[in-house]
Swiss-Prot record:
Residues holding GTP: 19-26, 81-85, 136-139
Reactions this protein catalyses: GTP + H2O = GDP + phosphate + H(+)
Region spans: G2: 60-64
Pfam families for this protein: GTP_EFTU, GTP_EFTU_D2, GTP_EFTU_D3
Annotated stretches, region: G4: 136-139
Name under which the protein is recorded: Elongation factor Tu 1
Function: GTP hydrolase that promotes the GTP-dependent binding of aminoacyl-tRNA to the A-site of ribosomes during protein biosynthesis.
SUPFAM superfamilies per the UniProt record, alphabetical: EF-Tu/eEF-1alpha/eIF2-gamma C-terminal domain (SSF50465), P-loop containing nucleoside triphosphate hydrolases (SSF52540), Translation proteins (SSF50447)
Quaternary structure, from the entry: Monomer.
InterPro entries referenced in this protein's UniProt entry, alphabetically: EF-Tu_GTP-bd (IPR041709), EF-Tu_GTPase (IPR050055), EFTu-like_2 (IPR004161), EFTU_2 (IPR033720), G_TR_CS (IPR031157), P-loop_NTPase (IPR027417), Small_GTP-bd (IPR005225), T_Tr_GTP-bd_dom (IPR000795)
Annotated localization: Cytoplasm
């Protein structure tokens, strides 16, 4: 069977369902697939296909995730749904499924529950920029006032975590009734799709962001100078661009005098490409793996940050024992390990394998970082945790 060609003509947006267990995330995912494919064309995925989420491994962590795709007239969406709460935690922290926006599913029959709150907090910590609310099971609530009350509660909860609770879209619907084909409830799914189209802005493509290349290797070429190699993470570097070398040591400026790929000289290196960048007047010993090459002023080196961390379970190849304050592992950022110390939240004495935890990390030397940067925690080359920079402190 021939592979379907990927149509590039519509903007591509990544979304996902979040919310408390049994509030109807997977049913809603199936309803979106059914209603949108019926209305705008496309392949339908039923509940069983979505619910039977395949196991994936991201940095050694086992995550069950379902991926579906659907179209609206103006966009193409990739949507992730996870069967279990632990899968959401892992997914959001590792960035296995980066979300441009999330659909928070809240059952009108229950209102916000503990995992509702935890998923909102996680979204805030890992940098999910936009949330849309789908109040589900509204067909089971006869009382108009009760629906208003639940909506108010959800909006207040979102505001508590710095999302614009008063302004974001809340759609009242029933995923099950929409899935059964009842027109009044199908209309609510179309309303949700319209909210996705209008409320979540089109994400900036990697190529349009400021240039960044994590340095993997450094060579000196006699008569030409120093070449750094790596995969361009974002943006474009052109010959004669001024660039900064950031992290590990004090930041220095230099100029790109050449770009090479597969031994050919190019005018530019673009996001996603592996290339070598020739640097003017830079000595071989001035640069090392673990630094980044970046557009001047676009990224700064930092040592201390608040992070959200998932600690691998024993079954995932992680630690067999808890760790305590004073733990000093390596933190792997992009291409290199840096030793760091941790500070646990007040009242937390130890962290067990399989836990997720907020911690403040202080590295022994600075690394180029922004909020949202992912890292691994390692001991002697073995991954024992995954984390994300939630807030830079220093």
């Amino acid at each position: 069977m021939a592979k379907a060609k990927f149509e590039r003509n519509k903007p591509h947006v990544n979304v996902g369902t979040i919310g408390h267990v049994d509030h109807g995330k997977t049913t809603l995912t199936a309803a979106i697939s059914a209603v949108l494919s019926k209305t705008y064309g496309g392949e339908v995925k039923n509940f069983a296909q979505i619910d039977n989420a395949p196991e994936e491994r991201e940095r050694g962590i086992t995550i069950n995730t379902s991926h579906i795709e659907y179209d609206t007239p103006i966009r193409h969406y990739a949507h992730v749904d996870c069967p279990g709460h632990a899968d959401y935690v892992k997914n959001m922290i590792t960035g296995a499924a980066q979300m441009d926006g999330a659909i928070l599913v809240v059952a009108a029959t229950d209102g916000p529950m503990p995992q509702t709150r935890e998923h909102i907090l996680l979204s805030r910590q890992v940098g999910v920029p936009f949330i849309i609310v789908f109040m589900n099971k509204c067909d089971m609530v006869d009382d108009e006032e009760l629906l208003e009350l639940v909506e108010m509660e959800v909006r207040e909860l979102l505001s508590e975590y710095d999302f614009p609770g008063d302004d974001l879209p809340v759609i009242q619907g029933s995923a099950l009734k929409a899935l059964e084909g009842q027109p009044e409830w199908e209309a609510k799914i179309l309303e949700l799709a319209e909210a996705l189209d209008t409320y979540i802005p089109e994400p900036a493509r990697d190529i349009d962001k400021p240039f960044l290349l994590p340095i993997e290797d450094v060579f000196s070429i006699s008569g030409r100078g120093t070449v750094v190699t790596g995969r361009v993470e974002r943006g474009i570097v052109r010959v004669s661009d001024e660039v900064e070398i950031v992290g590990v040591r004090p930041t220095t400026k230099t100029t790109c005098t050449g770009v090479e790929m597969f031994r050919k000289l190019l005018d530019e290196g673009r996001a996603g490409e592996n290339c070598g960048v020739l640097l003017r007047g830079t000595k071989r010993d001035d640069v090392e793996r673990g630094q980044v090459l970046a557009k001047p002023g676009s990224i700064n080196p930092h040592t201390t940050f608040e992070s959200e961390v998932y600690v691998l379970s024993k079954e995932e190849g992680g630690r067999h024992t808890p760790f305590f304050k004073g733990y000093r592992p390596q933190f792997f950022f992009r291409t290199t390990d840096v030793t760091g110390t941790i500070e646990l939240p007040e009242g937390v004495e130890m962290v067990m394998p399989g836990d997720n935890i907020k911690m403040v990390v202080t590295l022994i030397y600075p690394i180029a970082m922004d909020d949202g940067l992912r890292f691994a925690i390692r001991e002697g080359g073995r991954t024992v945790g995954a984390g994300v920079v939630a807030k830079i402190i220093a």
